[in-house]
Amino acid sequence: MALVSILPLSSKSVLHKSWIVSTYEHKAISRTIPNLGLRGRGKSVTHSLRMSLSTAVSDDHGVQRRIVEFHSNLWDDDFIQSLSTPYGAPSYRERADRLIVEVKGIFTSISAEDGELITPLNDLIQRLLMVDNVERLGIDRHFKNEIKAALDYVYSYWNEKGIGSGSDSGVADLNSTALGFRILRLHGYSVSSDVLEHFKEEKEKGQFVCSAIQTEEEIKSVLNLFRASLIAFPGEKVMEEAEIFSKIYLKEALQNIAVSSLSREIEYVLEDGWQTNMPRLETRNYIDVLGENDRDETLYMNMEKLLEIAKLEFNIFHSLQQRELKDLSRWWKDSGFSHLTFSRHRHVEFYALASCIETDRKHSGFRLGFAKMCHLITVLDDIYDTFGTMEELELFTAAFKRWDPSATDLLPEYMKGLYMVVYETVNEIAREADKSQGRETLNDARRAWEAYLDSYMKEAEWISSGYLPTFEEYMETSKVSFGYRIFALQPILTMDVPLTHHILQEIDFPLRFNDLICSILRLKNDTRCYKADRARGEEASCISCYMKENPGSTEEDAINHINAMVNNLIKEVNWELLRQDGTAHIACKKHAFDILKGSLHGYKYRDGFSVANKETKNWVRRTVLESVPL
């Protein structure tokens, strides 16, 4: 949401204290943002250890402002700069490369079918398990050709009833079919969810065939059924039934089986599923699971080699993460963000999110660009939400549209520094994107920013006038103000996938794929943040708008309705991501989708971006700050 303007800011009350060395000094990322030493009743406004309700304070000119006391930055620059790791040494890369060659040989041996370990009775499931393991371990980029060959082979035996464990299997089984369905659908093969109908109980509606005793083999089959059910398309009723059935079954199984690698796997799959499971976080979890595995299911595969590659790759990338994080922290410190006492500082968390989404070493531009854009819109969100006055916001929005450093002349001092950091950072990322795309990209970014700030101004007008919009009107504006286009568009353009204007339209606003993602993020954000927003005087949310249009409904009714909307929209996103009639490169759509997954991960229980809670700190630690034991 945007600002409540408690008192209008007159031209005489513009902050005049000079905190910036030179307004027109254009050295990249050198702009210093002022330390706003606001005082309320003689006390400095400082960070608290938790997020609290807004506090009204007055600046030196008597302008009342609202301050939300967010907890301070958890990862100071001294700590970040002190990080070290040995895994940047060439010997680790050389060891990983040797193992990659050996694993390519494992793929070849599976294809050879030696008649002893690999036979026509298990050749399909072994190919699927191999593909599933390398993907969950985050090392699949090394085996693209081998994966394609394995899946082409499996698909050649796919039929309307699914598949069995081998090419000579006479009967389809649930485990092979569910695992095969999931992997094939994710790789763009045409597979119908109707195959799952053949595994349902004839007499029990919504139930699937299972024995009275939960054997380990059966539990694994139902686990793969659950994983498959999460990539449902709209209208697939059998997928809904499969999700409900398998979730209940697996929760019961956890009560009955001993703590083991299987129970750990069930727990993390139920916890993060598909929509909130970021690639690097899944890799970290699966490394832990396989580290405890008794290896009985890997009789025909050398899992030790796969696991060692995964650990080496994880730690080698960890050394790159440290270098990038140090660069980001210096940018944050040198730009003066630490002096903004009214704003959240979550740049480390945003970098962790970016590096959980994109783990290719050559895409540093994506990770750093994503983290910087997220941090910038967080600061702007806090200004438009609480700190700025209406006149200041109008001035800033108008200055931004001019896109010229001289436009800062009329801005208050604290906005001048911020404007220049935004200006320089957007231009910096645009230059990198221009090289990747072979064309000018700044105008794409500027259009996204202008729409973003316009949506903030619309929300500011609602609040200042006390207007509560209709649900539809609210969503049209607020799905833009979430800022997805800002932190997704430019970083994606820095990647080495050429995106013409025509192709870009498939993943950018207002096309369906982008619109769905923006809607999901706004709806999920509101279910986690509406109480805190309301306490700060920001009434409009999807919850309050729904209740206005449905007299007599409760907050619980509204939240249930919104969650149902999100579930349906996610199915539509699945379809838009995986459908084969689009022209956009699947890798770009996948990155956009992974950004959605990462954002939803932060909203699983609460607003994990405003308040870096235990869960947030844990995944930052496990995916960025710590290596895995070899």
UniProtKB/Swiss-Prot annotation:
Alphabetical list of Pfam families matching this protein: Terpene_synth (PF01397), Terpene_synth_C (PF03936)
Biochemical pathway: Terpene metabolism; oleoresin biosynthesis
Annotated cofactor note: Binds 3 Mg(2+) or Mn(2+) ions per subunit.
Transit peptide endpoints, chain numbering: 1-52
Known catalytic reactions: (2E)-geranyl diphosphate = terpinolene + diphosphate
Chain sites annotated for binding Mg(2+) 3: N525, D533
Localization per record: Plastid, Chloroplast
Motif interval(s): DDXXD motif: 381-385
One annotated GO molecular function: magnesium ion binding
EC nos: 4.2.3.113
SUPFAM superfamilies noted in UniProt: Terpenoid cyclases/Protein prenyltransferases (SSF48239), Terpenoid synthases (SSF48576)
GO cellular component entries: chloroplast
Something else known: The conserved 65-Arg-Arg-66 motif may play a role in the isomerization step of the terpenoid cyclization reaction sequence.
Summary of the function given for this chain in its UniProt record: Involved in defensive oleoresin formation in conifers in response to insect attack or other injury. Involved in monoterpene (C10) olefins biosynthesis.
Free-text domain note: The Asp-Asp-Xaa-Xaa-Asp/Glu (DDXXD/E) motif is important for the catalytic activity, presumably through binding to Mg(2+).
Descriptive protein name: Terpinolene synthase, chloroplastic
Species of the source: Abies grandis
